[in-house]
Every structure is written in structure tokens, then in C-alpha cells.
Amino acid sequence: MSTPKQRGSTQEQRPGLNEVFPDSGRQFDDVDGLLVDRDSETIPTLSIVMPTLNEEAGIAECIQRAKNAIAELGVPAEIILSDSSTDWTPEIGRKMGAIVHTPDKQGYGYAYRYAFRHARGKYIVMGDADTTYDFEDIPRLLSHLVETDADMVLGSRLDGEIRPGSMPALHKYVGNPLLTKFLNVFYDAGVSDAHSGFRIFTREALETIDPETNGMEFASEMIMEASVNGLDIVEVPIIYHEREGEETLDSFRDGWRHVRFMLENAPGYLFSIPGVVLAL
């Protein structure tokens, strides 16, 4: 990876969400009329991508909240499930108007990468389909993306509110802050919650980042590549909710994969560990 570039800032006036999306706030009654299917000639403004692995307990709520956001924005959109489930998740998704794709490989990162190949929107949202993220926050994140002319917006759990039972104390007070610190030290990312799974970014940003990893380190890779390429990342505080359904992650294994990936790819790798020790 190359040396991180400096991200520039601008003071010029940016258009508001209503200027870019005139129908924003109208609340369309027939939201299904705004949903774009995979064969439609209509190009969606927004692609909402959710990786799913046996999420039948929460997928309906996630899709409904995403549809509420689409209705508020009043723009053509697609909801994409990148699904490897053995339960009723894909059937529920299709019934509610989502496009379901089945990745040909396993892995959190690969599920996203596979779906991104099929996503056609100008703006792309990614979020876990376990009810921990509120997809009705999409208009708020999109507003920040447009008004700040940023390339990516992260929903920050650590700057927002983490509801009781939604995140283990070890993750809240040690794991996530420490992993974020690593990224900020190595890549000057300047973020508070580098591993939030709720993000929105432009198509141009995705093409610049061009992620390659297949596992949980995918979340780190996106921030690393965005920083290296000088993309503007901004954050919006969000509420992190308790999940529906069984946990599918291995905390220690996935955390170590993040750390190892950051160390192996950090500028000045031989000096990475001493650098982190001095910075903490």
C-alpha cells in the first residue's frame, strides 16, 4: 500500500439534500413503486446492501426500515441481500421486494464484494441485517454525505449510543476503541468507530477503494484504502441496537484478523508495533 495522502477540506457552500433530491421528505405511500428490480431499465439512485446468514429473525424489520428510508427520500432504490442462509431469510427478502444474490464463496467481505458487483446505485449503503443498525437513519447519513461533499459517511456507535445488551463490554471499551486507534495511528483515518458496519459512500469511492479481502478484515480494508487514497470520511452518531437472532461472529478470531491485516499492510511495517506502543 502507498503512503497516506493528505485529505483536503473545502469551505465552499454545498447543496442540501432537498436540492439534490427534490422529493426528499414527501413520504411516498407506495414505496414498492420506488423499488428497482434487477432487470429494470431504471438506474437506482441508492443501493442498500445487506449480507445475510440465517437472519430470518430480523431481516423483515431491516428491510421495512430500509423501505421507510426510501419512501422518505423519494428516490428509485434497490435493496440487495447477499445471502448464504439455510433458513427463510431469502424467501422473506424476496417477498418484501429485495433482490437476492447468492455468493459463490463464503466470508463477510466476499458477501459485500459479490453484492457490490451487482449494485447499480449512485450511492451505496452497507449495513448488517440483524437489527443492530437502524436503516431509517439512511436519509441522515446521505444528507451528511451530500452536504459535506464527502466520499464516505460512517455511522459512529462510539460517538452515539450503544443500547444495553447490544455490544459486549469488552468490545465497547477495549476491542473497538483499540482497533480504531490502530487504524488512526497507521493510516491517519481520523475516525472514532472504524469498524462500524453502517456506511454510505459514492460509487466513485467504491471504485477507488476496490476492496479485495473476503473476511471480517474487509471493514478495516475499506477505511485503510479510503485513507491511503485521500478520500474524505465523515461520521454521524448513531444508536446501536440489540440484535435479533444468534450471533454469527467469533470475536477473538475476527479481532485478530483485523489487527494482523493492519500490521501486515501498514506503512513502515517493521516499525508498526513500536509505533503503536508509543502512540497508545
Predicted regions and their residues:
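Cell-envelope/extracellular polymer assembly enzymes that use nucleotide-activated donors
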Residues: T45-S47, E78, E221
